[in-house]
Amino acid sequence: MKLPFCRAALLAAALGVCLVGCKPAATDEPAASATAETAEVAATLTPTAATTAQPVAAEIGTVLPATEDAGRSYLDETLFIGDSNTVRYTMYADETGTAFASVDNSIGVVSMGAGAITTLKCEKFKGSSTMYTVPEAVAMLKPQRIIICYGTNNLGGSSTDATSYIKTYLQGLQAIQTAWPYCDIIVSAIPPLDKQRENTNLTMTQVDAYNAALVTMCEENGFKFLNSAEVLRDAATGWAKTDYTLSDGVH
């Protein structure tokens, strides 16, 4: 039976269209320098001063531009972290039949929100029964880069105030950065909703507001932002493209 097309498949493919990173070192020692993605901010891990104006992505370089496909090696060198949308990266395959991600390079937890990054013990390793938080697991995995996506489970009601969401998300990102400061951290956009969704309390107005807040957060703290939502969104309607979500209209 042919599976319905899920946005996770296209999103995972789009993740390869980031700036090309360097290959991971053969040892556990940290790389001598940052990759091209964050070289301009790697010299200091302290946040830059907050700006009062909306950042211009083309000038500050926060939003990653489209590039040529970086290939399979880019995906394999990347640790994907997130909620059920990330879980689905292991369920969908590319044209060769290879899953976009595996248990070796993904930490995905169904229904997880940004506030649980530092508290939820959600990862364990082969041969051990000990559970680890995301930052703890990252320190053990020592990835070349991270693409992280939380936010779908932080949506609720009709408020467009992303203050609490950004605060907890930033705390999680900083904890990851402290645990393993030798990798690039790329924050992926909250994916768009289907107009025909089960939970009508969730709106694209809120998604857009939260994503705009993510761009500002990334700019102020030296992270990169991957606008993955643009490949999933119908420019004419503002909602997710037809047939790019499951029956609930959210995933």
Indicate where each model-derived feature is located:
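Conserved SGNH/GDSL esterase-like catalytic core that processes O-acyl groups on lipids
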Residues: R72-K167
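Charged helix-capping and loop-helix junction motifs
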Residues: A162-G172, M204-Y210
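Gram-positive cell-envelope targeting signals
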Residues: M1-T62, I146, L170-I185, Y210-L214, ...
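Active-site segments of SGNH/GDSL-like serine hydrolases
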Residues: C149-N153, A175-D208
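Structured segments of extracytoplasmic/periplasmic soluble domains
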Residues: S84-R88, Y92, A137-M140, G172-A179, ...
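Catalytic His-Asp segment of secreted/periplasmic serine-dependent ester chemistry enzymes
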Residues: P192-H251
